[in-house]
Amino acid sequence: MAEFEDQLVFNSISARALKAYFTAKINEMVDELVTRKCPQKKKSQAKKPEVRIPVDLVKSSFVKKFGLCNYGGILISLINSLVENNFFTKDGKLDDTGKKELVLTDVEKRILNAIDKSSPLYIDISDVKVLAARLKRSATQFNFNGHTYHLENDKIEDLINQLVKDESIQLDEKSSIKDSMYVIPDELIDVLKTRLFRSPQVKDNIISRTRLYDYFTRVTKRDESSIYVILKDPRIASILSLETVKMGAFMYTKHSMLTNAISSRVDRYSKKFQESFYEDITEFVKENERVNVSRVVEYLTVPNITISSNAE
């Protein structure tokens, strides 16, 4: 009987201790849930119609190869699909035809020749969008109302002045208080959207000179999308556990691998780096407030000098 009573006391103590333990743990979990900010759900947006790329702005040999000459415009999704299904091996690696016919930089070709196809650094289907985008080139001019307008990054003021002079856009004097405001017709917006792949930001067909200038600056800026990037310091590869290849004095890794490695070390709620990781890279990245991954990639890499091959 005494032994039974001792067991009851022991069980009673264990139950109280267990209850206290679980209560403390539950409180900690609740506190963590309360202090954390739940990621906001993105508002559902109506899917925008896909822009068609004018045939003359797509690499001519690609157009001929796939019989696209008579298309009124080529969807970028079609270009993506053709690239993925015709220039890659069954295991998703760029094949020899792709190396010859797609637009690759000289550095990219050298890297591909220096590494094995089984290497995670080898160009694969994750790079399809970059390769497909290179098959289209930016327009150097557009036509409207019988006039031809040339697009040059250092002559945008001249372009806007010419549009005004030709009355392709009209100054709206009533709205022009802090900045010159222009009326831009729907027909011109359609031409710009078709030819330059994006529309200017307008409200009720009105646009400020500043926004119009920024628009033409963006559309005339050269696309510098890279498959490989140069690391500023070999230690970065070690910190992020990145595969690399050395070309001369430079150490290269894949842009996508670097981006993914950085993203995986950012807390999804605070948008800050994990403290231990930030301590390792603080020499290269000076702040840890709401990390912009693309900006951090810039901090950790050296700008590439791009020389394209197979371009037309």
From Swiss-Prot:
GO terms for cellular component: virion component. It comes from the Viruses. Disulfide bonds: none annotated. Pfam families: Pox_I1 (PF03289). One of its GO terms (molecular function) is DNA binding. InterPro entries: Poxvirus_I1 (IPR004969). Belongs to the orthopoxvirus OPG077 family. Each virion contains approximately 670 molecules of OPG077. This is Telomere-binding protein OPG077.
